[in-house]
């Protein structure tokens, strides 16, 4: 059994400039833990694989294509591959999001 604590995982240096930690990385999937402080946002980008966002804390706004929705804890949002998406935190509370990409992307996300 492998156990990994998010708090003991290093923060990745990404163009998004937010707290992003890769907590699972396998050829079948990739899992990223993101913390968005109030006012922070991911940059619009396109991922070459399907992904979903699971809200652990806070109430971030999820943008997928032309749609956007502010979502609550324990909500799952699907994001199909090759569609522009981003997550923003317009609230006054921290937002924590689990991002699952399957299968693991072979290339990097494309920033817009």
Protein language model annotation of sequence segments:
Residues 49-60, 65:
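Glycine- and acidic-residue-biased ligand/ion/polar-headgroup-sensing regions
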Residues 81-106:
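Ligand-binding loop in jelly-roll beta-barrel domains
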Residues 27, 38, 48, 67, ...:
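A generic "binding-loop/recognition-motif" signal
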Residues 32-47:
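Conserved short histidine dyad/triad with adjacent acidic residue
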Residues 66-81:
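Short acidic-glycine-tyrosine-enriched beta hairpin
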Residues 41-42, 61, 77, 81-87:
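Histidine-centered metal-chelating micro-motifs
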